[in-house]
Amino acid sequence: MDIATNAIDCIHTTAASHGRVFIVELMGHKVGWLTLHAGIAGGADIILLPEIPYNFDAVLMAVKQRNKAGKRFSILAVAEGAISQEDAQLSKKEYQKKKANSPFPSVSYELGKKIQDALGQEVRICCAGSYAARRQSGCL
């Protein structure tokens, strides 16, 4: 939990100084408790979880509102299993086929591309090492 929280917290300076959108992808293929707690503790602006399919337009609106308020950066904490409302409507087989044919390695990269295309704002993806986040103290 500390590693995931620190990953989000440490990105604030870079995101703010460069006016970027940062997507921090965290563990959570089926459940998003780690992403939720780390997102809150680390100060993420938007948190996407596998349990709640997200609406891309709502995510985009939240980033736009932050920009309009003078906050030229946004940090999204995204669980690796986060899914859009559109994709949640697909059958399991259809969704697996879509993922297999996707040019993106994960949901974060697809989301980042869509945000960058819609806003023209630079987006960076940070995958906060799943293996490091699972470690026991003293292992690294």
State each model region's role.
Residues M1-H18, F22-Q121:
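Accessory alpha-helical/coil subdomains and C-terminal extensions
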Residues E110-L140:
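C-terminal active-site/capping subdomain that shapes the small-molecule cofactor and substrate pocket
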